[in-house]
Amino acid sequence: AGEPANNEDRFNY
């Protein structure tokens, strides 16, 4: 995903 709506796409803690 280039710019995911939710940050969970890039940083899933």
From Swiss-Prot:
Name listed for the protein in its UniProt record: 13 kDa protein
Subcellular location: Microsome; Endoplasmic reticulum
Superkingdom of source: Eukaryota
Organism: Triakis scyllium
Keyword Chaperone set for record: no
GO cellular component: endoplasmic reticulum; intracellular membrane-bounded organelle
Key words of the record: Endoplasmic reticulum, Microsome
